[in-house]
Design a protein with these regions (language model features):
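Structural preference for solvent-exposed beta-strand-turn elements
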Residues: 1-357
Length: 357
């Protein structure tokens, strides 16, 4: 096997797949990338047995073959080479030679036959999703995923397929984030799947936005996302996601409209003097005014006041300031709506201009 590519052309697919490879592995071959050259196309595959990423690019000067090469070493070598370098990778027995100009590196390889693949994938549903739409779904919801929760089904992101729409939902039991986008032509089916945290993070890193349409395929135990140059596959979490619609506040008729960035800045300032353990802030709403206060065990106190468009006579409610800041960071609207019922009920935060998140 042999191929030659410009450094920048090789670096892009390498960067796409190398993050899938774990730094510590149970199998030595999992530290490697599967490298294949077939009919003028180079494919690079990385996996941790839960997530698999395959990146492809065209090569002109190439000889067909396949092997596995240490992922991070190859990536670091190519990244460290000068811009504009022509990189030639050659296989000689169980050794891989990487050459660029006067630089030459020799790496150990493992047989391609030892490289594991994710279980056989058979798609039961296929939908087309705008890349920008899927990127937005993940960016606006992934922050609310649980981390290492014993309720394992919360350690991921729910994809709720509903004929003409796709929803993403995440919750850690304290807060919930939801966003939806329209599907091109609809799906004709309904299904819920849970993608694990690492799969969500790798998919988010992969998506670039833009006008491209992605092929999203759902199998019995996997999700696959296809783009011209990349195929992403992830195992699913086998569990039932909570009935999230039951916890979305209904009847929250006390509405506050406020500038998102102004509220975010005020919360950040007030949080400096909040209790470091509980991170609580008190939000008081009165006609035309939003008052934020925080205090800590040292008897220190912060107060912020903001002009707001309110439909509330008077109400005080406590929040974890980190949860509010995460929600405001995920929204993109200039103004947000804070929908309240009473001091003991959940609050709803959403964009004032685009109410799909």
């Amino acid at each position: 096997m042999r191929f030659s590519l410009q450094r920048e052309v090789l670096l892009k697919p390498l960067a796409q797949v190398v993050n899938v490879v774990e730094r510590r592995q149970t199998l030595p071959v999992l530290a490697n990338l599967l490298v294949k050259v077939r009919e003028g196309q180079l494919s690079l595959t990385g996996t941790d047995l839960e997530v698999e990423m395959v990146a492809r690019t065209a090569v002109d000067d190439a000889q067909d073959g396949e092997t596995t090469i240490p992922a991070r070493k190859l990536f670091e070598i190519v990244r460290a080479l000068p811009d504009g370098s022509k990189v030639t990778v050659t296989q000689q027995g169980d050794k891989i030679t990487v050459q660029a100009g006067r630089s030459r590196f020799s790496l150990a390889s493992l047989p391609a036959n030892d490289f594991p693949s994710i279980d056989e994938f058979e798609a039961t549903e296929r939908v087309n999703v705008p890349e920008a739409g899927l990127k937005e779904l993940i960016e606006r919801t992934a922050f609310a995923m649980a981390q290492q929760d014993v309720r394992y089904y919360l350690n991921g992101l729910l994809f709720d397929l509903r004929d003409t729409t796709l929803r993403c939902v995440a919750t850690d039991g304290h807060r919930l984030a939801l966003c939806e986008t329209a599907l091109d032509g609809g799906s004709g089916s309904k299904r819920q799947i849970i993608v694990p945290r690492k799969g969500v993070q790798e998919l988010q890193r992969l998506l670039e936005g833009g006008d491209r349409t992605l092929d999203l395929e759902l199998g019995k135990g996997h999700i696959r996302v296809k783009r011209d140059d990349v195929t992403f596959t992830s195992k699913l979490i086998d569990g039932k996601f909570p009935d999230y619609e039951a916890v979305i506040p209904i009847g929250a008729d006390r509405e506050v409209k406020v500038d998102r960035e102004a509220l975010r800045a005020a919360l950040q300032r007030a949080s400096i003097l909040s209790n470091e353990k509980y991170r609580g802030v008190r939000v008081e709403v009165s006609p035309g005014l939003l008052k934020i206060s925080a205090h800590n065990p040292e008897q220190e106190e912060a107060q912020e006041e903001l002009e707001a468009d309110t439909r509330v006579d008077g109400l005080a409610i406590g929040f974890n300031v980190n949860y509010l800041l995460d929600a405001l960071g995920a929204l993109r609207d200039e103004h947000i709506l804070l929908l309240l019922r009473d001091a003991n009920s959940s609050a709803l935060v959403r964009g004032a201009e685009h109410q799909h998140a």
